[in-house]
């Protein structure tokens, strides 16, 4: 009989103790654990606290957008003075007597909410005798024929990227809240437009990532029109960018980090091994593999001895990480213990077990990469930051199932910006509304308090 709170596999007493220690180490890699600053101890010690295509299908009826006839605000804009062509700059433009009008539907945000606005921009057309063409006022031309303003489009993008709403749901929300009819293709167009406007933000994030002392990297599968492709993530814990490739080959990844002189933190996928910079491999990945094999082979004495020896090595190391942080002066002393572990269990010990040999080869291959964090300040020993950055993409993958390639590229750019805002505890929506292109320069506005603490001592 199996109980819900009982392990599904049996193991020895030593194995149970080792599983418990490894579970504690894996838990210590989580963000919540690092915030709470729990210390690692062995079991006998106390634990202390310290998308669709753009446009309709062929054969479907076409629709013409009806522009609102009543505007809540009318803005007069200046006419163009000089011809936009460089060779005609000296040519004065003559008024044609015709009016240029453009209506924008937008959202106005305040501290307590938002409301729909309809603004009509009115100006005069001018004519260039050399170009033989008419020109509208610059303030009207910058709208590029768009009916919806920046804040409206940014709000729709926020619903899709941050809240993961399907296009059909966003269409319904817009209809119910703002009484505006927008098609799913219209939402896709919003995504394209906003992604294009914030291309500079992504480029700036990549530049800052490459200037950081360490980079977290990871990859995951994605379905593009039913074909399996891969999404790559790069992050320094503050900025995030994504890239899409057709295969798992790391060519594009190596091009991105070409010339990087910091430390690359990754899992054990072979594509990362060709990086020319220093590397730190993810310990939780290795510990999970050891834990899984220990469950599968509970009575494998030689493997159990190997795992126990490793446990005795890493527990004091991670205990010092929790106590002192990732400081070289406190961790460098463990290098001698690492050398002793390799001498006794890797280099000077021949074991017939294929399972143990597999891990011996793995430890030998990644000897330097496993312990880089002991010799440098501030280098994380896990890759959970990259996994945290890419998890949003994994959830969206379950919801959407498949993406179109071009739509996926725009989505990933916006997701990188959203995750960068999240890592900096900033609102993705309010960043888009601000018009700022540098996430680091954007400052969150203080929000009004919605609650206050109850003082029980005063009887409140």
Where are these regions (language model features)?
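DNA-recognition alpha helix
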Residues: 168-179
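Short, amphipathic alpha-helical "recognition" segments used to contact nucleic acids or chromatin
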Residues: 149-163, 322
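Short, flexible loop/hinge motifs at secondary-structure junctions
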Residues: 1-144, 188, 217, 223
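Short conserved beta-strand segments at catalytic cores or DNA/RNA-binding microdomains
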Residues: 127, 158-166, 226-240, 283-286, ...
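Conserved beta-strand -> loop -> alpha-helix junction used to position metal-binding or nucleic-acid-contacting
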Residues: 268-269, 273-309
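Mobile genetic element proteins and their domesticated derivatives, centered on retroelements
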Residues: 25, 83-86, 128, 156, ...
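RNase H-like nuclease fold core
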Residues: 3, 31-34, 46, 53-59, ...
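Acidic/histidine-rich catalytic cores and adjacent linkers
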Residues: 7-9, 28, 269-271, 305-460
């Amino acid at each position: 009989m199996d109980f819900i709170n009982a392990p599904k596999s049996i193991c020895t007493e030593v194995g149970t103790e080792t599983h418990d220690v490894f579970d504690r180490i894996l838990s210590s890699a989580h963000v919540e654990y690092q915030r709470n600053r729990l210390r690692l101890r062995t079991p006998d010690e106390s634990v202390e606290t310290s998308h669709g295509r753009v446009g309709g299908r062929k054969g479907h009826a076409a629709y013409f957008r009806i522009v609102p006839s009543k505007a809540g605000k009318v803005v007069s804009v200046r006419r163009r003075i000089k011809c936009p062509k460089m060779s005609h700059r000296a040519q004065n433009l003559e008024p044609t007597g015709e009016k240029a009008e453009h209506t924008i539907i937008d959202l106005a945000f305040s501290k307590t909410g938002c409301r729909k606005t309809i603004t009509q921009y009115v100006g005069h057309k001018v004519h260039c005798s050399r170009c033989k063409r008419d020109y509208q006022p610059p303030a009207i031309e910058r709208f590029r024929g768009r009916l919806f303003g920046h804040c409206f489009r940014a709000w729709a993008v926020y619903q899709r990227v941050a809240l993961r709403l399907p296009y059909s749901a966003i269409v319904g929300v817009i209809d119910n809240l703002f009484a505006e009819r927008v098609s799913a293709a219209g939402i896709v167009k919003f995504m394209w437009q906003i992604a294009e406007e914030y291309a500079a933000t992504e480029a700036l994030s990549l530049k800052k990532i490459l200037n950081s002392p360490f980079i977290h990297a990871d990859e995951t599968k994605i379905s593009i029109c039913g074909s399996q492709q891969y999404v790559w993530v790069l992050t320094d814990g503050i900025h995030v960018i994504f890239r899409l490739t057709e295969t798992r080959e790391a060519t594009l990844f190596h091009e991105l980090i070409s010339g990087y002189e910091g430390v690359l933190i990754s899992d054990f996928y072979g594509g990362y091994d060709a990086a020319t910079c220093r590397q730190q491999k993810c310990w939780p990945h290795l510990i999970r593999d050891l834990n899984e094999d220990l469950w599968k082979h509970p009575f494998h004495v030689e493997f159990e001895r190997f795992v126990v020896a490793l446990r005795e090595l890493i527990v004091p190391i991670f205990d010092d990480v929790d106590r002192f942080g990732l400081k070289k002066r406190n961790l460098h002393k463990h290098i001698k213990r690492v050398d002793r572990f390799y001498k006794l269990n890797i280099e000077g010990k021949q074991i017939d077990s294929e399972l143990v040999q597999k891990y011996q080869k793995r430890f030998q291959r990644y000897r330097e990469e496993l312990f880089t964090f002991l010799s440098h300040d501030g280098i994380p020993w896990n890759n959970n930051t990259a996994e945290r950055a890419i998890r949003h993409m994994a959830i969206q993958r379950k919801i959407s199932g498949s993406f179109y390639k071009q739509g996926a590229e725009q989505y990933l750019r916006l997701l990188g910006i959203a995750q960068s805002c999240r890592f900096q505890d900033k609102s993705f929506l309010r960043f888009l509304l601000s018009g700022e292109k540098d996430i680091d320069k954007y400052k969150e506005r203080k929000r009004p308090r919605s609650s206050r603490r109850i003082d029980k001592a005063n009887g409140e």
